[in-house]
Regions:
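A ligand-binding cleft/hinge motif common to bilobed small-molecule-binding domains
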Residues: 94-108, 175-178, 218-259
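Extracytoplasmic small-molecule ligand-binding "clamshell" domains
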Residues: 35-101
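Extended ligand-binding regions for polar small-molecule ligands
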Residues: 59-63, 125, 130-144, 249-320
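Ligand-binding cleft/hinge of the Venus flytrap
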Residues: 58-66, 154-156, 166-215, 246-247, ...
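An extracytoplasmic/periplasmic, membrane-proximal ligand-sensing/linker region
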Residues: 34-40, 46-57, 283-351
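Secretory targeting signatures
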Residues: 1-29
């Protein structure tokens, strides 16, 4: 009889087919889709002489921590980062403070964390520096609330770090305009009006240096004050000590005065460090919390510390949010004439 052998053959064939079918995923899903993913917008170089500086090591670290497929999305500008986050091409990105503020204000991007500066802070303070004995210094030091050192800046010669620099121009001018000391001169929608606003409040000799000139940058602004070319220098809270307050005096600049000659007026506001941005409309709170925890874990291991140092150029990361990290900066620069249009053009953002 042939029935029994035929039955056995059919049984074997069905068993083999069942095994094959059991190992095949549905046609709309493959192995890569069984895990969540994370895309990081990052400016990637064509080649890295030091492999430890390659952001791929950051990607690999986060992939292991999150159990996600983490990839890099190459970008070439801050504007491209904003666009990538807006339209969901990338999930997170490390950004410049000014571009981050634009992304937050115009497109409701959020902040997960921020990098630390060498002193552990996630910001630096912008200040006006004057010389001891000046009427501005005396007004500040006299403990008399009726004497206002900022009002006394009117008509003086200012020393800025450069055109549209944060601590050297945007933050102090945003403060002076926003608090009614200075009045915008010209078209309030044109960034060029800021130059006339500066000379209108201070005087025509306001020092707004170009790159490569003697008074450019933080050192240049303090030099401008020190040699009395100007009456006030706008710089960071740490600037004077960096150039003129070293324990070994040979490290000080030759134009420095004694540290007791410099008086720091109250701060205008905070310039933020680089934040890690994301789009809350694309990433839910649970995933955002997981990503933040993985990023902060970089602080906790030798491997993570190497990535922080070599790839991100920071001693550490701190959890924060957009309001806390960008609010002080934005509250001041919003008073600068034409600033939104300027940033839109600078970062090539299409509305």
């Amino acid at each position: 009889m042939m029935i029994k052998p035929i039955f056995l053959i059919l049984l074997i064939m069905m068993s083999s087919l069942a095994g094959c079918l059991g190992s095949v995923l549905p046609p709309d899903m493959d192995d890569s889709e069984s895990r969540d993913s994370l895309v990081i917008a990052y400016e990637v170089k064509d080649d890295y002489e030091n492999p430890d500086e390659n952001p791929q090591v950051l990607s690999d670290f986060l992939s292991a921590k999150l159990d996600m497929d983490v990839t890099l999305y190459p970008i070439i500008s801050e504007g491209a980062i904003i666009e990538a986050l807006r339209f969901g091409h990338a999930d997170i990105a490390f950004m410049d403070g000014a571009a981050a503020w634009m992304g937050w204000q115009q497109y409701e991007l959020g902040v997960l964390a921020a990098d630390q500066k060498d002193d552990g802070r996630t910001y630096y303070e912008a200040h006006a520096w004057v010389l001891n004995g000046s009427e501005m210094a005396e007004a500040y030091l006299d403990s008399d609330d009726s004497t206002d050192p900022f009002a006394l800046l009117q008509g003086k010669t200012s020393c800025h770090t450069g055109w549209l620099k944060s601590a050297g121009m945007l933050l102090p001018m945003g403060y002076l305009i926003g608090n009614g000391y200075a009045t915008v001169q010209g078209n309030s929608d044109d960034i060029a009006s800021l130059r006339d606003t500066i000379t209108g409040f201070f005087n025509d000799n306001a020092n707004i240096p170009e790159s490569g000139t003697p008074y450019y940058g933080y050192a240049g602004a303090v030099k401008c004050l020190s040699d009395e070319t100007g009456d006030v220098a706008f710089a960071k809270d740490s600037t004077v000590a960096k150039y003129c307050g070293n324990e070994n005096a040979s490290y000080n600049e030759d134009w420095c005065l004694g540290m007791e000659r410099y008086v720091k007026l109250p701060g205008f506001g905070k310039a933020p460090s680089h934040p890690i941005m994301y789009n809350p409309s694309k990433i839910d709170t649970t995933k955002a919390a997981k990503i933040t925890a993985a990023l902060l874990s970089l602080n906790d291991s030798p491997e993570g510390q190497e990535i922080l140092s070599n790839v991100l150029n920071t001693p550490g990361l701190v959890e924060t949010n957009a309001e806390d990290h960008l609010g002080s900066y934005g509250g001041l620069v919003q008073h600068i004439p034409g600033i939104s249009t300027y940033f839109n053009d600078k970062y090539s953002i299409e509305n």
